[in-house]
């Protein structure tokens, strides 16, 4: 696994909007100002500005046009760091953009170049946490980011990143935040613990991993529910190269130490049978990414 190592100066969040781009940056060096430039992909300069803010919005851009965002940190008039350049494309988007990665932006390779597997969690304090992994087919698929909002989702900021972490689900239980995730596509099933999403424990392994050829655990950010004194969530096993996935559940007592793998149980995995009553007709190879739900009768 090639680890993600943040640069001394980095654009850590992008939020394109209607004729605009918003971004957050972080610097691990001493600085007194930032110089921001926006170029078209043919090199034409569109905007330039100096700022002492780590959150910037630039407007007056053309929707549907690809741009290159460049950022340098300065101190006493000298450039002390240059951030990796970021691609973006403004446009009208529904809701609020938590984070954005242009499909041709390779900054997070080899994990991938597309945000995926979103998870959203409200803490007892009212703070919202949101996470996504970084995906692309046949890539490492092992990096996730966690963001926070303290104003009901109006604004967001980066809290942390987790690696290895893929297909992750945020959930809260008895005073702690957890991330249930894979180490990679069909990798090991892992569990992380945090107080508030900013810093995380080392992961513990709940199920051993496989690979795309042999098959392995598979999950998505599906609900974690409490029922009959246990926490439950859905888990699959298989791979597309093996023709599909079988389905199961994992669970743990609600009063157990969730970071103790010996406390967890797996039901085993039920292969799909197209002869089941009510099964879909056609070429389906099975079910995937199901929900654990509590029926009305308990």
What feature does the model see in each segment?
Residues 13-17:
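Short, solvent-exposed loop/linker segments at the N-terminal edge
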């Amino acid at each position: 696994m090639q680890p993600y190592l943040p640069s001394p100066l980095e654009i850590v969040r992008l939020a394109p909007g209607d004729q605009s781009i918003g971004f957050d940056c972080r610097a691990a060096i001493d600085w007194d100002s930032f110089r921001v430039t926006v170029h078209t992909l043919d090199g034409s300069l569109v905007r330039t500005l100096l700022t002492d803010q780590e959150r910037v919005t630039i407007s007056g851009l053309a929707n549907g046009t690809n741009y290159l965002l460049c950022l340098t940190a300065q101190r006493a008039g000298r450039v002390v760091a240059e951030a990796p350049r970021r691609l973006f494309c403004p446009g009208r988007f529904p809701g609020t953009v938590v984070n954005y990665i242009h499909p041709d932006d390779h900054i997070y390779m080899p994990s991938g170049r597309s945000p995926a597997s979103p998870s959203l969690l409200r803490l007892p304090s009212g703070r919202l946490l949101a996470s996504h992994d970084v995906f692309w087919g046949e890539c490492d698929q092992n990096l996730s980011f966690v963001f926070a909002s303290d104003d009901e989702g109006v604004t967001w900021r980066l809290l942390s990143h987790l690696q290895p972490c893929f297909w992750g689900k945020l959930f809260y239980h008895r005073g702690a935040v957890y991330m249930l995730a894979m180490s990679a596509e069909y990798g090991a099933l892992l569990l992380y613990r945090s107080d508030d999403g900013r810093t995380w424990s080392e992961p513990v392994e709940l199920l051993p991993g496989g690979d795309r050829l042999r098959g392995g655990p598979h999950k998505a950010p599906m609900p974690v529910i409490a029922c009959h004194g246990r926490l439950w969530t859905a888990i699959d096993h298989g791979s597309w190269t093996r023709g599909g996935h079988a389905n199961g559940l994992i669970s743990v007592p609600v009063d157990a130490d969730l970071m103790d793998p010996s406390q967890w149980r797996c039901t085993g995995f039920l292969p799909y049978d197209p002869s089941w009553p009510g099964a879909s007709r056609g070429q389906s190879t099975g079910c995937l990414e199901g929900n654990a739900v509590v029926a009305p009768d308990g």
